[in-house]
């Protein structure tokens, strides 16, 4: 045994005491790599929902309702052609309502943890309502006031420097 590695003594351990390197261990390459270094990238960015997933979930809800109708009609022993006809009518009606934007039940307040795209979509809509309620312009940039104030101060300093240069050119220095 060397350099305090391994067992002090292999007696009673059921091993030979031979120390091996763990070849499955992967050493991290860059310790700070996933974290950005500039402050602008640390600001919160609104997570954008995937429109395809949201559309798929809405269509899935429609198909669940159609399947419930089909199951109910099959229990009532309705003719297969009639079942297909009614299911198609319901599907067309629900898809038309979905396309018009009319969703039953109003805005959904509670989401399950796996519904991240629905939560992101609801958060964007909530932020938009809040922005309109507070009459904030759509092109508002956070910290824009400070940037404008800094720009005004910078232009005032430049103007003052230019005025001093003008005064220096007009009146020659006296001996």
From Swiss-Prot:
GO BP annotations, alphabetical order: mRNA processing; RNA splicing
Enumerate composition-biased segments (Basic and acidic residues): 37-55, 115-126, 144-159, 166-175
Q: Where in the cell is it found?
A: Cytoplasm; Nucleus
Ranges for domain CWF21 = 54-97
* One GO CC term on file: cytoplasm
Point out the coiled-coil segments of this chain. Answer: 57-94
Q: Does the keyword Cytoplasm apply?
A: yes
- Gene3D superfamilies registered for this protein in UniProt: 6.10.140.420
> Where is the segment annotated Disordered?
25-55, 98-126, 144-175
Q: Does the keyword Amino-acid biosynthesis apply?
A: no
Where is this chain compositionally biased, Basic residues type?
Answer: 105-114
**Record's superkingdom?**
Eukaryota
**Record keywords:** Coiled coil, Cytoplasm, mRNA processing, mRNA splicing, Nucleus, Spliceosome
Q: Which family does it belong to?
A: Belongs to the CWC21 family.
Subunit comment: Associates with the NTC complex (or PRP19-associated complex). The NTC complex associates with the spliceosome after the release of the U1 and U4 snRNAs and forms the CWC spliceosome subcomplex reminiscent of a late-stage spliceosome.
**What is this protein's function per UniProt?**
Involved in pre-mRNA splicing. May function at or prior to the first catalytic step of splicing at the catalytic center of the spliceosome. May do so by stabilizing the catalytic center or the position of the RNA substrate.
Task: Please give the name of this protein.
Answer: Pre-mRNA-splicing factor CWC21
């Amino acid at each position: 045994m060397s350099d305090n590695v391994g067992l002090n003594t292999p007696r009673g351990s059921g091993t030979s005491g031979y120390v091996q390197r763990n070849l499955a261990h992967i050493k991290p390459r860059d310790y700070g790599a996933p974290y950005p270094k500039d402050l602008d990238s640390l600001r919160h960015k609104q997570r954008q929902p995937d429109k395809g997933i949201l559309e798929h979930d809405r269509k899935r809800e429609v198909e669940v309702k159609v399947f419930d109708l089909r199951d109910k009609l099959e229990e009532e022993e309705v003719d297969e052609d009639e079942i297909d006809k009614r299911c198609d009518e319901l599907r067309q009606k629900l898809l038309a309502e979905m396309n018009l934007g009319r969703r039953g039940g109003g805005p959904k307040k509670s989401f399950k943890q796996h519904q991240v795209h629905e939560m992101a979509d609801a958060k964007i809509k909530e932020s938009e309502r809040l922005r309109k309620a507070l009459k904030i312009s759509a092109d508002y940039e956070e910290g824009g006031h400070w940037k404008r104030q800094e720009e005004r101060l910078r232009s005032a300093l430049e103007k003052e420097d230019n005025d001093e240069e003008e005064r220096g050119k007009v009146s020659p220095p006296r001996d």
